[in-house]
Amino acid sequence: MTGGDEPPVCGIVLAAGAGRRYGGPKALARDPDGTPWLTRAVRTLQSAGCSPVLVALGAAPDAADLLPADIADVVVVPVPEWADGLAATLHAALGAAASTDAESTVVVPVDVPGLPASAVRRVIAAAAPAGVDGLARATYGGDPGHPVLIGRSHWAEVAASVSGDRGAGAYLAAHAALAVPCDDLWSGADVDTP
């Protein structure tokens, strides 16, 4: 729950890929201080009020072992078809989200270790009035980025709209997702190289 009277929002961490450009699965990547990106992503979503947090793993299923024992309310979602691309990961994660009582989900890839919880909170707050029909994404300098919030009423359509390594961007654009400027909080940059 996001606290107070706000509707429940679950978090999704997309971490199933092989990380070809990175040189290995980003689910196994760590900050210079040794903090796993996976742990950072889960804690960021939890700090923003997301519960549960679903972690989609495929190429590196053992990455779940990197999560500290003190992190509660995390569900590992296996993605056996991870090699089919981002679409397989979104299908698995949104399918798992359907078993929660969440009205919406916040989606982040594991390769945005700099993402602050404040950006997640801002996107959640901006989309809250729409409830299950919410559709929003952070923007940085006018460019779309993460996090992305998808209301429950969109989950099936989003899952049907993605294929291969094509994510939900086209769906978000076609359905006029609310653009939430977050460039005052962070650069929006993902990490593609070690």
PLM segments and residue spans:
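Short beta-strand-to-turn element immediately C-terminal to the catalytic PLP-Schiff-base lysine
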Residues: 29-31, 149-151, 191-192
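A short acidic, helix-capping loop that chelates divalent metal ions and anchors anionic groups
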Residues: 20-24, 157-158, 188
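Short, glycine/charged-rich beta-strand-loop motifs at protein surfaces that mediate ligand recognition
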Residues: 111-113, 155-162
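Conserved alpha/beta core of the MobA/IspD/sugar-nucleotide pyrophosphorylase nucleotidyltransferase superfamily
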Residues: 2-7, 160-194
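Conserved nucleotide-sugar donor-binding
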Residues: 102, 143-157
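Nucleotide and nucleotide-moiety/phosphate-recognizing core
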Residues: 4-144, 176-182
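A residue-level structural signature of the nucleotidyltransferase/glycosyltransferase Rossmann-like core
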Residues: 112, 146-149, 188-189
